[in-house]
Amino acid sequence: MEEIQRYLQLERSQQQHHFLYPLIFQEYIYVFAHDRGFSRSILSENRGYDNKSSFLLVKRLITRMYQQNHXIIFSNDSNQNLFWGRNKNLYSQILSEGFSFILEIPFSLRLISYLEGKKKKIVKSQNLRSIHSTFPFLEDNFSHLNFLLDILIPHSVHAEILVQTLRYWLKDASSLHLLRFFLNEYCNWNRLITPKKASSSFSKRNQRLFLFLYNYHVCEYESIFVFLRNQSSHLRSTSSGVFLERIYFYGKVERLVNVFGKVKDFQENLWLVKEPCMHYVRYQRKSXLASKGTSLLMNKWKCYLVTFWQWYFSLWFHPRRIYINQLSNHSLEFLGYLASVRMNPSVVRSQILENSFLINNAIKKFDTLVPIIPLIASLAKAKFCNLLGHPISKPVWXDLSDSNIIDRFGRICRNLSHYHSGSSKKKSLYRIKYILRFSCAXTLARKHKSTVRAFLKKLGSELLQEFLMSEEDVLSLTFPKASSTLRGVYSSRIWYLDIICINDLANLK
């Protein structure tokens, strides 16, 4: 760690380009990356890993990489590749750990230098990491807007384009050249940045490099919004990220000015996309750009974004990845919710002297609903019910103790209720609780070779109260001193600031 700090101080003091290639041959880099815990469980499966991850091994790997025939290195048949041999998984794991740790250094330096130059301080708050912190932003702003650009960030990009993009940030040809060799070993780039298509073995072995490259790729697409935000002071944006998003929002404006300077008549055509009220939010590959303008303005935005991304990344960006929807009659699938802006009618009685009359007012309200059909599909995939939503037993858990079975069902139920506490209509969650309740009862009845009715009649319904805890009980336990003042609050929307990931029903032990 001291070696890294000395290197960073030397790099920052000299203010030179980031020559990271010598760090690849430093053993403490791999030890430090290993101790970060990104793949600790997988690394522990290889006995003697710390002995294998040495300076001599890394140097030998890189030397052999450059000496190999290009026809062998770029071969599609991984079994015929003589470079990796039998230890392909271990070698790629070692190099990916080193790459991921070393590539983060210039981004950290840029962030530190910007903060020192601007003398700004970032408020460190874990609450800003919560997924639920995005919804108050949507409530405050989206209810006043009209149109929405529903954007799906593309994932298909060639490895060479990524390396060329990294050259804007990283001025080290040797490191980029070695990274190009490593990426070409996995010639299918979709496997690198598409979580659904990535093989489990690759994503586990290269999880840190996987996340870094994916976030970098996504942030490159977001770079256009950073530039336009400085052109129009009313362009407001937020992003549900921690590391790379801050760097791009702080330090990428200068390079974007140079990049956009190459586009002919860019400044003259900027008025086409200027809008006094624009809001942008993104989570993973799903992003939304809302506006108070007209349909014509949103079509100009769509055309502009497609043209820019095609020119900047040198790839085909299909216009159908951007949908123009009207917020008043469209529901946005975002972060496990169905969000929409609906008209909330309100009748006010007014009386002047002896005359009284009614005034009908329609107020726009941001509405969030629980997507019941996708939730039932997730429960069916996890074998808690069938596709029609009828509860079934969980035979995989039949060998566990009764208390362990009830605890697992209760934890799933509480997590779902906790995450969907921001729903406008919580009655839809009753069906989910019903499925989990009777699935738990069916599992226990099957274990004891009895029927569900006889099992509940024998043991009583109190056995299942643990995972049927209501939101009011959760608030009472969370705020015991203010339990009397919180009556009725549980019926409204509640956003928790301790949720950092979407509940995955398939990720069960």
UniProtKB/Swiss-Prot annotation:
| The protein's name | Maturase K
Q: What does this protein do?
A: Usually encoded in the trnK tRNA gene intron. Probably assists in splicing its own and other chloroplast group II introns.
Q: Into which family does the record put it?
A: Belongs to the intron maturase 2 family. MatK subfamily.
Query: What are the TM regions of this chain, as residue ranges?
Result: none
Subcellular location, record wording:
Plastid, Chloroplast
Q: Which Pfam families match?
A: Intron_maturas2 (PF01348), MatK_N (PF01824)
Instruction: Give the matching InterPro entries.
Output: Domain_X, Maturase_MatK, Maturase_MatK_N
> What GO molecular function terms would the record report?
RNA binding
Q: Which UniProt keywords apply?
A: Chloroplast, mRNA processing, Plastid, RNA-binding, tRNA processing
Record-level GO cellular component terms:
chloroplast
Which cysteines in this chain are paired by disulphide bridges?
A: none
**GO-annotated biological processes:** mRNA processing; RNA splicing; tRNA processing
